[in-house]
Swiss-Prot record:
Biological process terms in GO annotation: D-galacturonate catabolic process; D-glucuronate catabolic process
Pathway assigned in UniProt: Carbohydrate metabolism; pentose and glucuronate interconversion
Family: Belongs to the metallo-dependent hydrolases superfamily. Uronate isomerase family.
High-level lineage: Bacteria, Pseudomonadati, Acidobacteriota, Terriglobia, Bryobacterales
Documented EC number(s): 5.3.1.12
Top-level taxon of the source organism: Bacteria
Source organism (scientific name): Solibacter usitatus (strain Ellin6076)
UniProt catalytic activity: D-glucuronate = D-fructuronate; aldehydo-D-galacturonate = keto-D-tagaturonate
Gene Ontology molecular function: glucuronate isomerase activity
A Pfam family recorded for this sequence: UxaC
Keywords from the UniProt entry: Isomerase
Protein name: Uronate isomerase
Amino acid sequence: MSFIHDDFLLSSKTARRFYHTFAEDQPILDYHCHLPPQDVAANRQFKDLFEIWLEGDHYKWRAMRANGVPESHCTGNAPAYEKFMAWAKTVPATLRNPLYHWTHLELKRYFGIDELLNEQSAARVWEQANAVLATPELTAHRILEKFHVKAVCTTDDPTDDLAAHQAIAASGLATKVFPTFRPDKALHVHAPELFNPWVDRLQVAADTHISTMAEFLDAIKKRHDFFHAMGGRLSDHGINHAFSDFPSEHEAARIFGRARCGHAATSEEHGKFAAYMMLVFGRLDAEKGWTKQLHLGARRNNSTRRFRELGADTGWDSIGDWPQADALGTYLDRLDLENALPKTVIYNLNPADNYVIATMIGNFQDGVTAGKVQFGSGWWFLDQKEAMQWQMNALSNCGMFSKFLGMLTDSRSFMSYPRHEYFRRVLCDLFGRDVENGELPDNDELIGPVIRDICYGNAQRFLGLNV
């Protein structure tokens, strides 16, 4: 039997029935990812397996480094085939890491390759995959069609012109591609060398002059309006933790003015400015019926040496352990008091916070929007089988699992769509075990619609995207 077979990860007859009946054929709504919209607009055709699979993949780079592979074959200038060979030699060493599952699931689904990837099979895999990539079968557009992706939400800076999204909308592509408003740089008053060039770009994008806090906020709103006009209905924030030391408008303006003059905000000032801006962003989202996403808890760029050499997002990040409950509860409560709490999805990176988040979301359900505040799917280091189960169990135990928005790729790679399949198999295995243990009724009419909703329906209804 092939390693990746029809019943992969499905440990019971009931799980297999649930998956093949209710989950397998559901479309995909990838409501948070990092796909380059330029690649979609250009209908990129990938030259080889390296380009589509290893280019920019920090998950693989971390594994390769741990296997003794030099940086030249991760992010460096080694030839593409040599980098691929270094990965192929690494794969057998990743046993019990989710990379081993993902690698073989992706080879099977994209190229029909059944054999295990290792040093001995690498040349055959390279040749077979590249032969498919040389045809029109796996261009960016064809991949989205192949995996029945109804919509993709990219992650975009407020200063982005969204020209690629406009081109995609005009192309006739069946998959809708929407922007997501990610204004992280708007908080960087503690780093004027980053903040001020960004504000300068914001001036250009908003076609306005920015010298005061009021003008800054007006420019932010103009860009938020533009994203809305382009079909965007989600925002996203990558922050260590929520901010809750709310300053006055005057104090926020003072911190902004000093940053514009090149004076770095202190840690306390940064926290206050961030708290002020996160309220601004929450109000904007609520006014337009958007969904706010909070990605909490990543400790980034741990290796100063490697960050200086290679920059961000190259594989030097890990799980942080900041306290989350107090500031998060205070932030959500402040918006709720103003009747300005938008639909919200909270993703935590530290599994120690699972029950914190699973219980926190119950404090702010409004009795109008089902599942208004959501515990997001396992993120980054937690988007693997065990951590998916942890998240699902915490949400089930403390909340309304049936209203869960389900999976997203959170990926830069066009090869990541089988992660939705992976999630769905884990989901159906969970329900199957419960049924076979007598903990849930063996009733397809009861459980089947819940599985379908978690796979697609809940997200489709909740997010308000024009899909």
